[in-house]
Amino acid sequence: APAVAAAAASVTEDTQITTSGTLPTPSDTDVHDTVSFLTQRGAPGTYGTFTLSADGSYTYALNNTSPTVQGLGVEETLTDTFTYTVSDGHGGTASNTLTLTINGTNDTPSVGPTFGFVTEDTLTVLNGALSTPTDPDTHDIPVFVAKTAETGLYGSLTLRADGTYTYTLNNSMNAVQGLGQGE
């Protein structure tokens, strides 16, 4: 009867989303039997697909668009497991598993646009709050980095760690004072 050992491999979200290799060489107590792997073409797993050739060479392709995969942070992992079978061609078979470790990476948080308006001579200070930030990494909590009086082209912005801000228009600038009605 044939025998075959278990195997392991890994992929990494966003960077190395496929892996290829060769499964352990099977053995058989019947020395005259030729043992081969039963092929699998695009076998679906929980997080990707597995393809296996009769010679034991395989490819795993991670579904990198999966929200669960994208939800992984640094040092977080998932596993996808596939069972493979070898045959001696005379009715004897043996099975084992390929365990794929999916490693997470740090995904960039994002925040949507925020709009506000100031008006020359009348509304020169604007207080507001930025849009709520999001992060695809499930366990990461994005925060704002406080900035004190960042000077822009026409005024200054103070951003607090809670996402609230104050924008102060430099109303004394010639460019600001030169604005016409509705500009």
Task: Tell what function each PLM region has.
Residues 2-45, 94, 110-151:
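Extracellular ectodomain surface segments
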